[in-house]
Each structure stands twice: as structure tokens, then as C-alpha cells.
Amino acid sequence: DIANISSLTNPDIDVAKTRDVLGDPQTVNYVPFRNMMMLSIACAYAESVGASDVFHGAAQVDSQAGYWDGSVEFLEQINKVTALNRRDQIRIQAPLIDKSKQEIVEMGIKYKLNFAKTHTCYEGKEVACGECTACSSRLKGFVDAGYIDPVPYAKDIDWESYGCKSIEY
């Protein structure tokens, strides 16, 4: 039962915090073959509606965190598999796969993304925890870009001490 081996599918396993996973090649947050399953479903849907592209949200930090199915190598290999389709050619694209969180934040600001409508936290609650690895990575991206994340966090973030400014569109 794959639901029992990941902190993202089993509420009895604590979600890893940044301090817990440094140097760990495969964290407890890993869900076996998650991206492959979701991309397979997305490709099946794309074929059924005549779409030729599926977009995957993998970022540079995913492969750095040990998620093999968020890596450039995975993207290349899964595209080789989709190319075997004799009926419709569907290409999986991951435009953020080589981008840091800082670059993604900067890109979002450039295109006026409403970050308040995005959610990253692994805890699955309405208010982000600010401590899981996903929140830590997101927070670092905003700090490195010099902006205040408009998403509410369960812990206080002293944005001012980092010299961050509000996003203004």
C-alpha cells in the first residue's frame, strides 16, 4: 500500500522539516512515482482532447531535494516514452525545471502572478506552516528575490530583516 510510505499520503508520518532532510537523498515526503502517475493521466487526457503538450511544474529544487521524477533526466526519458505513441505525439514540457525558486518568483512578478492564490505547503492546511521543506524552499525564493510572500504563514516571518519589499503591480 503506497499510501503508508509517504508523509504526503499518510497522516501518521510527520512531514519532513528542512533540518530533517539535509543530505537525505530520498525524504519521507517522497510519493513513489507520483509525477509519473500524474503525467500519465495528463497525457491520456491530452490525447483525448487533441492537445499536443502537457506542462509539468518541476523546478530545479525538486531534483536537488531527491525527487528523481522531477529531474531533467526523468523529463527526457518520459518524453521518449510518450514519443512511442503511434497515434498522437504529446510532449511533456517543464519550463521551470532549470529555474531556482528565486528565478521562479522573479518570473511570477514579471508576469504579474497573484502569488496569494498559490499554495506550496506540504502540511495541507489553509495557512502554510512555514517550516516544511516546501515552505522553506518557497520562503528562500522570495527572500533571495527580495520580495514579501503574500501567502499567510503559521509562523512569523521577519521580512523586514531580510530587506524584502511588497509586490506591487
Region locations from a protein language model:
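ATP-dependent adenylation/nucleotidyltransferase module used to activate substrates
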Residues: D1-K112
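A polyampholytic, Gly/Pro-enriched intrinsically disordered region
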Residues: L22, K112-L113, L139-D144
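Structured loop/turn residues at beta-strand edges in well-structured enzyme cores
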Residues: V49, A116, G130
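Conserved S-adenosyl-L-methionine
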Residues: I2, N114-Y122
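Short loop/turn hinge sites at secondary-structure boundaries
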Residues: G124, A145-G146
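Local cysteine-cluster metal-coordination motifs and their immediate loop/turn environment
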Residues: S40, H119-K140
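Short Fe-S-cluster ligation motifs
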Residues: S136-R138, F142, I148-Y169
